[in-house]
Amino acid sequence: SRGLGDVYKRQTKLIRERGVMNGRLTSLRPDSAAVEDLKGWAITDAVAHVTCREPYQIPSPLPRHHVVLWDFGAKQNIIRKLHALNCDLTIVPASTTAARILSYSPDGIMLSNGPGNPKDNPAIISELSHLCKSGIPIFGICLGHQLLALANGADTEKLKYGHRGANQPVKDLLTGRDYITSQNHGYAVKNDSLPDNAVLRFINLNDGTCEGVSYQDFPGFSVQFHPEACGGPHDSEFLFREFVALIERRA
């Protein structure tokens, strides 16, 4: 209706000026207690609600490598991309320990996308810090990118607006090339918090925030955007091949 349209218009202006905030659609005028409750509301245990419950395997018809996919809410297309590169996959829940992951003898470890504040996952961050010492190639996407950064001593921050949509431009500082990427996140790794073992590789061309990191003391890298996007731009699909190349160099 026209009235509903006006409501959305007013809220859009408010968000534009003040940034992302909690909201509630109601036909009643809320009292002060309801407003305070809304201000304090936050998503909790987001990853626990979207991860798989038990480990499972997806064999490749022409297996060349074995990859453990640590599932924080993995998109199906991550599985498809790895499978297309002849990777046998073992998908494990977010609660899996580093020791358990290593018991699968993976050639590579994939850290999936997922929801929520990365700092809400201290147990995962702790386990991931152990995996970084294993020498096994690691590739992180979205939340996986943020968790890998935190495990190496970097910091993250909540963005005022977040990055949403299938047309987010990023620059590869290694090659100088620009790419159009698909993104959907409200947190970012802080550029100035990267440790000495990390190199900023990708930046967002709209606001300069971190979009990807390469690590110098172990074979690992990560990106904030979604190279597996479907539908969406396929510009950065080559990152899956880079991951497989890391695996093959270690073999």
Where are these regions (language model features)?
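Short, small-residue-biased leader/transition segments that mark boundaries at the very start
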Residues: S1-Y8
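Flexible inter-domain linker/hinge segments
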Residues: K13-H66
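Residues that mark the start of a beta-strand
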Residues: R64-V68, D88, P137, I180
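Short helix-loop-beta junction
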Residues: Q76-I91
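Redox- and metal-dependent alpha/beta enzyme cores, enriched for Fe-S-associated oxidoreductases
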Residues: I78-R80, A94-Y104, L111, F139, ...
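Cysteine-nucleophile active-site neighborhood
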Residues: G108, S112-A188, G232-I247
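Catalytic beta-strand/loop cores that center a nucleophilic Ser/Cys/Thr
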Residues: G176-F218
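A glycine-centered loop/beta-turn motif at secondary-structure junctions
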Residues: G212-R250
